[in-house]
Amino acid sequence: MTYNELIYMVLDELKLSSDDSYYTPDHVIFLLVKYRSFLLKQRYSDIKKQIPDSDYQSICLDLIEVPAISGEPCEGSSYLRSKNKVPTTMMIGNPRVYPMDFYQGEITYISRDRMRYVGYNKFLRNIIYCSKAPDGYLYFKSWNPQFLHLEKVSFNAIFEDAKEASEMACPEENGTICKLEDKEFPIEDALVPPLIELVVKELRGPEYSPKDEDNNAKDDLPDAR
């Protein structure tokens, strides 16, 4: 389901109760992103459960060579680093990294604590290790120096800000870059109804209920419009 389809569903619900109100698509998207994150945390934070691929997003990252991980001592070898910072990932799911060019080696995503201990075993020479550092970039290392020829990767994860990640999505196979509204919104079908409900509820705000200031038991309340 695309951003546009979800926006339409929200606005269609709101027409039932508020014909004279105006809601911008940008604000609806902001709330969709906000409550998507809330619903995914609520559903998956405390249980070990398979998360559907529809909750994940893939972003494209260009890589550059650097002498060390920011904040870590220089070890004399080279690293690859994403050219741009990576959007914040949620603490659910299993991030995955894939090469996007000729390199056929395996890329293994690991914690940043493990990063300092890997990449020294010649028997695992074809494995590239990858981790997100505190500075927000992805770093890559390997025993095999050929990994330095890797130029671009796809990073697949569940991101906190779906809009930010969507703006870094890979182009279509024909090179087309879709507008945000035409892209798939990353949420499983089962969570669409509660997502729409939460967004509509916030946009409606508190329901207006006129008060009987005189408390005289007469049917003389003003019309609520």
From Swiss-Prot:
Transmembrane segments: none annotated. Disulfide bonds: none annotated. It is found in: Virion. One of its GO terms (cellular component) is virion component. Keywords: Virion. Residues 206-225 are annotated as: Disordered. Homododecamer. Forms the tail multi-ring barrel with ring protein 1, ring protein 3 and ring protein 4. The barrel is composed of five stacked dodecameric ring structures. Podoviridae-like phages usually possess only one such ring. The tail is thus rather long. This is Ring protein 2.
